């Protein structure tokens, strides 16, 4: 029984892994990796869906697509960034994920202190 459950779980994981790797289909075309499908629904008439790159630092962004997997104006953020409310009137923008920038600053600070200690030892 445990063996059957383990096999079923493994198959389920494989199915989900395959779904994530499939490229996004947008307006009859497949989008490249690190892109999403956007269809501007504002203004006169609807634009046809188009592939857009994922958001970069400070780019406008969206968090959730519609029921068809299409975003209304902007892609979500790329890797290492999160879609965060910024400024007035709380527009969503891609920002560094919290903790990442702090960690990099901390590691830079520790490197600098090690270097300065090393230079003191060599001069003394």
Curated annotation (Swiss-Prot):
Residues 1-17 form the signal peptide. One of its GO terms (cellular component) is extracellular region. Belongs to the neurotoxin 32 family. Disulfide bonds join 26-37, 31-51, 36-75, 61-83, 77-94. Probable ion channel inhibitor. It comes from Chilobrachys guangxiensis. Residues 93-108 have a biased composition (Basic and acidic residues). It comes from the Eukaryota. It is found in: Secreted. Gene3D superfamilies: Lipase, subunit A (2.10.80.10). This is U33-theraphotoxin-Cg1b. Residues 93-124 are annotated as: Disordered. Keywords: Disulfide bond, Ion channel impairing toxin, Secreted, Signal, Toxin. GO terms for molecular function: ion channel regulator activity; toxin activity. Expressed by the venom gland.
């Amino acid at each position: 029984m445990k063996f059957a459950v383990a096999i079923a779980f493994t198959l389920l994981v494989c199915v989900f892994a395959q779904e994530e790797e499939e490229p996004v289909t947008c307006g009859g075309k497949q989008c490249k990796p690190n892109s999403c499908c956007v269809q501007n629904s504002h203004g006169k008439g609807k634009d046809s869906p188009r592939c857009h790159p994922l958001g970069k630092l400070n780019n406008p962004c969206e968090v959730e697509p519609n029921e068809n997997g299409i975003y209304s104006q902007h892609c979500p953020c790329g890797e290492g960034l999160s879609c965060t409310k910024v400024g007035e009137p709380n527009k969503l923008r891609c920002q560094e994920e919290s903790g990442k920038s702090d960690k990099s600053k901390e590691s830079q600070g520790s490197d600098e202190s090690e270097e300065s200690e090393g230079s003191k030892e060599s001069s003394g």
